[in-house]
Amino acid sequence: MVHDLLRDRADLEARWNPSAYMQFARLRQRPVVELLDNIELCCPERIYDLGCGTGIATELLARRWPLAELHGVDSSVEMLEEAARLPIKASWERANLRHWCAERPASLLFAAAVLHFLEDHGKLLPRLLGQLAPGGCLAAHMPNWRDASWYRLMLDALDSAGPGGASLGSPALRYRLHRRNVLSLDNYYRLLAPLTAELDIWETEYLQVVDGNDPIFDWIKVSALRPVLGELDEEARRRFLDRYLELLHRHYPRELDGRTLFPFRRVFIVASLGR
């Protein structure tokens, strides 16, 4: 029954779904708070929340710096419509971050759980630093999920759930999913240290405790799984979900209290320019 319901909703879930994304709002807010706690700006004039989504981070930015000129940027109309309902003073812009440029130099570029979707960080991050005002700061956190069990299981299902153990989806899709966008911490240091006056890089692993029949799937279907659900046809999607849910249940069993443990690692970067 659960599998059938998930299949029926797959086309919807392949798009950004604000209500589904907000299902774990408290857990998604934790790394935002951790990142904010490590930003030492006093009175930033202009803040851009890149990949603002439903405005989880934007609202916290507005509370921290109520006098700042605040801009939320996202590629999803649905997410921006949800964010625009927040009781905060902010402007909202639809844009693809691959090509986005700030209209005016930023005091703070805040990127919560978005840069890992973009490739070639060796060019991306220097380009973002170039849009900061003197003394400005680029602050980002990114899920470091490439080696996570649930991600490897997703790749396994995609590579072997077809008829006779064949792969599913196009070679281009499998290439994108196998590619690593997030760099190692030392490589971020080597990239950013020559370009910044102050640099702080760290990684945190959260032991997330989640509820529900398929909580791991519920978490990733609105983010990492979107390219898969969006590309596979109905039959391929059925095969993939059958296999993937089986693997998830096996590797993430429920605890005695009925909840599921979901370890999740994130990389944090706070890079500041000199004045």
Swiss-Prot record:
Gene coding for it: tam
GO biological process entries: methylation
Top enzyme class: transferase
Keywords: Cytoplasm, Methyltransferase, S-adenosyl-L-methionine, Transferase
Species annotation: Pseudomonas aeruginosa (strain UCBPP-PA14)
Pfam families: Methyltransf_25
Sequence similarity: Belongs to the methyltransferase superfamily. Tam family.
Name this polypeptide is given: Trans-aconitate 2-methyltransferase
One function term, GO molecular function aspect: trans-aconitate 2-methyltransferase activity
Entry EC number(s): 2.1.1.144
